[in-house]
Curated annotation (Swiss-Prot):
Keyword entries, A-Z: Carbohydrate metabolism, Chitin degradation, Chitin-binding, Disulfide bond, Glycosidase, Hydrolase, Plant defense, Polysaccharide degradation, Signal, Vacuole
Family of the protein in this entry: Belongs to the glycosyl hydrolase 19 family. Chitinase class I subfamily.
Domain (Chitin-binding type-1) ranges: 19-60
UniProt keyword Signal, yes or no: yes
Protein name: Endochitinase 1
GO molecular function, one term: chitin binding
BP-aspect Gene Ontology terms: cell wall macromolecule catabolic process; chitin catabolic process; defense response; polysaccharide catabolic process
The protein's enzyme class: hydrolase
GO cellular component: vacuole
Induction remarks: In response to infection, elicitor, ethylene, wounding.
SUPFAM superfamilies: Lysozyme-like, Plant lectins/antimicrobial peptides
Broad class of the protein's primary localization: other
Amino acid sequence: EFTTLFLLFSVLLLSASAEQCGSQAGGALCASGLCCSKFGWCGDTNDYCGPGNCQSQCPGGPGPSGDLGGVISNSMFDQMLNHRNDNACQGKGNFYSYNAFISAAGSFPGFGTTGDITARKREIAAFFAQTSHETTGGWPTAPDGPYAWGYCFLREQGSPGDYCTPSSQWPCAPGRKYFGRGPIQISHNYNYGPCGRAIGVDLLNNPDLVATDSVISFKSAIWFWMTPQSPKPSCHDVITGRWQPSGVDQAANRVPGFGVITNIINGGLECGHGSDSRVQDRIGFYRRYCGILGVSPGDNLDCGNQRSFGNGLLVDTM
């Protein structure tokens, strides 16, 4: 009888102190960077995170191919974003930290770990290039150049509106505004809603978590990066070579390369009309980061001759 009571108490204690995750919970994610065990529970010990025990949000993976730290080190991160803690930047105080990035990335298997080392480095360079443009505090004559000032801002600059589109699926919460926040400057209730559901946070009622919680902030950007929204492929699939353009894409000059990622993000405003200073800014960040990571940028960096997929999912804030 004692043994039965002890086991029952243990089960109840486990249920109260852990969150279900993974295949046992419809793909739910663990909070706070915890690992999801093969049994569907969240934790941070070897029983949850170790080889053979972890089903998702695992630290790296088997061998170099799964180790994001082997693609971008802490020192490279600091070199790429070397003015993010400038006194003029909202992110000063190390809001955008390397540890927060690595923790957030662990929730998205495949991010920065797909393909050979060249593909993995290009993905990281492309991700930080696009998000650096969205958050840049640089100017043409800035110290160390304009492409050393990514990740300066947390929130959309100026006087943004509420970006609320009436929706029964993603209803706006009273008094909440869905302007651009975080590395990708996610905006609109119809993006905050599905992003929050995917990462296990109520962003419709708490949108400012994207600008106050470092890990959630990075997760919002990586969620957008990894998520296709038809007819657009995901940025991840484009940069890793998994996306194959259809006949419609080819007729629109949408071919694999960094330029299509710009088209995905803000093609309605930036692509299809020749040279655009915003597109060139994105390319400038990308070339710099490829240099730091030691990889070539590949082909098709511009989108000036591409027809857009349509309006961007994001509002261009810079």
